[in-house]
Design a protein with these regions (language model features):
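Active-site loop/oxyanion-hole signature of alpha/beta-hydrolase fold enzymes
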Residues: 40-44, 53-98, 264
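Gly/Ala-rich beta-loop-alpha elbow adjacent to hydrolase catalytic centers
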Residues: 99-103, 107
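Catalytic histidine neighborhood in serine/cysteine hydrolases
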Residues: 236-252
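Alpha/beta-hydrolase fold catalytic core
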Residues: 1-27, 47-51, 86, 91-92, ...
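Conserved serine/cysteine hydrolase catalytic core
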Residues: 184, 189-234
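Catalytic histidine-centered segment of alpha/beta-hydrolase-like enzymes
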Residues: 250-259, 263
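Flexible "cap/lid" loop of the alpha/beta hydrolase fold
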Residues: 112, 120-150
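Conserved HGGG/HGGXW glycine-rich cap/lid loop of the alpha/beta-hydrolase fold
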Residues: 16-65
């Protein structure tokens, strides 16, 4: 599955397919600093029942990124090209979608713009964006400062990034050292550009579109991630055919902190009425 990130760029997005492509497909979209590798342990548990497609988003993993065209259009161009490749793929039936954080924001835009492509979706620790242009401008300015830190001292940035309270439960988890090492595989210049082009400040708000949702969605949030618990509650109130699952004792990275529970909830939801 070859995906280009922009109508003005031929940069391919790297993907990895886990198992037979004739099985029902689940598309997995990772968060900022991650890659498709984040989903491999989960995909391996699902390989007897699903073809798991692990996407490296622009500027992450093996996917390059180029700053061609209007930066305000890049987010939705990424959404559009993902949808185009999915609609052109050999399997005609709708697929399942899972997105975390940055990948969750992209996934939510995909669902609302191209509902015919998807059977069900799980959105993890993500939001429909910022409601006002003033908020988006402020966020772009903040993200620019973060991008410069990435470019100046990548290792120092990674250390400081995971000092944030929303990652406290991950940092105390046995998996943290592995996660930290995987983050450092990424190219810092690409990550900085990805933040500038795919950050929340560049994302068009989809709050007003939630009421038009046509795809069954489960929103996941960690109990300790209070910001996204509240966002999840707000989304469920606006979004038809949706529900919120709160993961006890977990923070922002609940799919890493409690993979067993995540897999259980995913299979329950995707297998229901299959």
């Amino acid at each position: 599955m070859s995906i280009t990130t922009s109508s003005n760029s031929e940069t391919p997005l790297n993907t990895e397919n886990i198992k037979d492509s004739s099985l029902p497909r689940i598309i997995f979209l990772h968060g900022f600093l991650g890659s498709g590798i984040d989903w491999v342990p989960i995909a391996q548990e699902l390989e007897n029942d699903y073809c798991c497609i692990l996407v490296d988003l622009p500027g992450h993993g093996e996917s390059d990124i180029e700053a061609n065209g209007d930066p305000d259009l890049f987010f939705m161009e990424t959404v559009d090209t993902l949808a185009e490749e999915l609609s052109r793929s050999a399997a005609p039936e709708p697929c399942y979608l899972v997105g975390y954080s940055m990948g969750g924001r992209i996934a939510l835009s995909l669902l609302l713009r191209y509902p015919e492509l998807f059977e069900k979706a799980i959105i993890v620790s993500a939001s429909p964006g910022l409601r006002t242009e003033e908020e988006r401008l402020s966020r772009r300015e903040s993200d620019e400062g973060i991008a410069r830190k990435i470019e100046r001292n990548f290792d120092g940035f990674i250390k400081a990034w995971y000092e944030q309270p929303l990652f406290a439960s991950l940092k105390n988890h046995p998996i943290f050292k592995e996660v930290e090492s995987e983050r450092k595989i990424n190219n810092p210049e690409n990550l900085a550009l990805a933040l500038r082009l795919l950050g929340t400040g560049r994302q068009p708000s989809t709050w007003d579109e939630l009421q038009q949702n046509r795809v069954p969605i489960q929103f996941f949030a960690g109990e300790k991630d209070l910001k996204f618990v509240e966002i999840g509650r707000q989304m469920v109130n606006l979004c038809p055919d949706s529900s919120l699952e709160i993961f006890a004792e977990c923070g922002h990275t609940l799919h890493l902190e409690n993979r067993e529970l995540f897999l259980d909830r995913l299979t329950q939801f995707f297998n229901k009425h299959q």
